[in-house]
A protein has these predicted regions:
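Cytosolic, long alpha-helical scaffolding segments
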Residues: 1-261
Length: 261
């Protein structure tokens, strides 16, 4: 028995160490990416050639939009997994990341607005709409994820009844579709290769339509069935925020294409 106890204790320690290493690696990667973006901005500020300044700004916006979609993928996954599996650790991670991203994104946006003032006037006029469309929708995503998170935290933290399995079975394919869209959009933006972007935008619109159908079906269920109203409304609001997230992500992709090309 003592040997078994020691074995399980060792396994527990190894799991804790593995989680610490994974978390530290994630933080190191985030810091390295932010340092790279900051270095790029310093180069942009020192540059006096307008054409070169435009290329530096283009790289900066490409990186920050890539970062926001990576943040969106990770945070959406943590929120939905935390809700479906009643895992407060995932939800706390999402909460921390959202607060962190709010500060990071404000700094990025402020720097890029300065960059827009340094490029050629005609280029700035041409790209201004697409720049602000991307920025505004990135901000919408951050605050939309916060709205999605808050009722999930309240639900799981208070040990309310879990999501019914039929909700989970219905929602998992939606989560997978959203994740795939964000992954491909992130790759397009980071590489500047927008081949197939029109098809991806159509796919994104189809995902939005499927979520809308599920939302309407859920509204009908709430009116028709004698179910747990709190859980039913939580699921409905999660679907609503997911649909809004998809809409904003599509706008970012479309804006990035027009800004970069």
């Amino acid at each position: 028995i003592n040997h078994l106890g020691g074995f399980f204790a060792m396994i527990l320690v190894m799991c804790v160490v593995a989680l610490v290493v994974i978390n530290n690696n994630r933080k190191f990667k985030q810091k390295r990416e932010q340092d790279n973006v900051d270095t790029l901005f310093r180069q942009l500020v020192r540059c006096h050639d307008k054409a070169e300044t435009w290329q530096l700004l283009l790289q900066h916006v490409r990186r920050t939009q890539t970062d926001i979609l990576e943040f969106t993928r990770n945070t959406f996954r943590n929120i939905t997994q935390g809700l479906m599996h009643e895992n407060m650790k995932f939800l706390r991670t999402a909460s921390h990341d959202i607060e962190n991203e709010k500060g990071i994104w404000k700094r990025y946006r402020r720097k890029e607005i300065l960059g827009m003032r340094k490029i050629d006037y005609l280029v700035a006029v041409e790209k201004n709409t697409w720049f602000h469309l991307g920025c505004n929708n990135a901000t919408q995503i951050i605050y939309g994820l916060k709205r999605m998170l808050e009722p999930c935290v309240e639900h799981v933290d208070n040990n309310f009844s879990p999501l019914p399995q039929d909700y989970v079975d219905e929602f998992i394919p939606v989560c997978n579709d959203v994740d795939h869209f964000l992954e491909v959009a992130q790759r397009m933006i980071s590489t500047g290769n927008f081949e197939g972007v029109d098809e991806l935008l159509v796919e994104g619109n189809a995902i939005k339509s499927r979520i809308s159908q599920i939302r309407h079906a859920q509204q009908d269920r709430i009116q028709r069935e004698d179910s747990n109203i709190k859980i039913a409304l939580l699921y409905l609001s999660t679907l609503q925020e997911t649909q809004e997230l998809m809409s904003a992500a599509r706008h970012i992709l479309r804006a990035s294409k027009r800004f970069q090309t």
